[in-house]
Amino acid sequence: DWQKEIFRDAFSTDHNVSMSGNIAGQPFRASLGATIQNGVIKTSTFSRLTGSLSYAPSFFDKHLNVNANLKGMWAKNRYADGSVVGDALTFDPTQPVYADGADYMTSFGGYFQWTGKNEYGDPSWPLAYNNLAQANPVSTLDLQQNRAISRSLIGNLELDYKFHFLPDLRIHIN
């Protein structure tokens, strides 16, 4: 059953913790998060770590308000080739996942594939992949390494100043 070979029960976790309070009467907030998701296709995974800091002090009898924010994220993703779903539905169910023989190990990592005559003249490549036939969906998942790592850091600083001599006059910088 090719579907049993490529699919799995997906399990995910998502954890967050935050803390807020005052340091010397000045408010702050900090948070951390972690996400781990395993996709329904066996090799698909996603992991993410997040963090944020916020600090909002006031100075000069609350005439100068500051709001500083910093947010960061790191994510790692392994993508599964979506074509394996169609291949699993239509691949010959009588064929094995793995093939016996040194030629299959050399050419296809030990996985069964529909082959054709090698017309390239390269003796180190004993079998040729038949590109008119479907690929073994398990070999597609295991031999492809579609990965990505993402990182981002965003910061913001906001200043709001009310003049002492004219409180309705303000300067706001963001």
Model-found features: residue ranges?
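Outer-membrane beta-barrel transmembrane strands
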Residues: R8-A24, G33-A34, A135-N174
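Surface-exposed loop/interface segments of Gram-negative outer-membrane beta-barrel transport/assembly proteins
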Residues: D1, V40-I41, T50, S54-I154, ...
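Outer-membrane beta-barrel translocator/receptor signature
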Residues: D1, R8-S52, F60-L64, L153
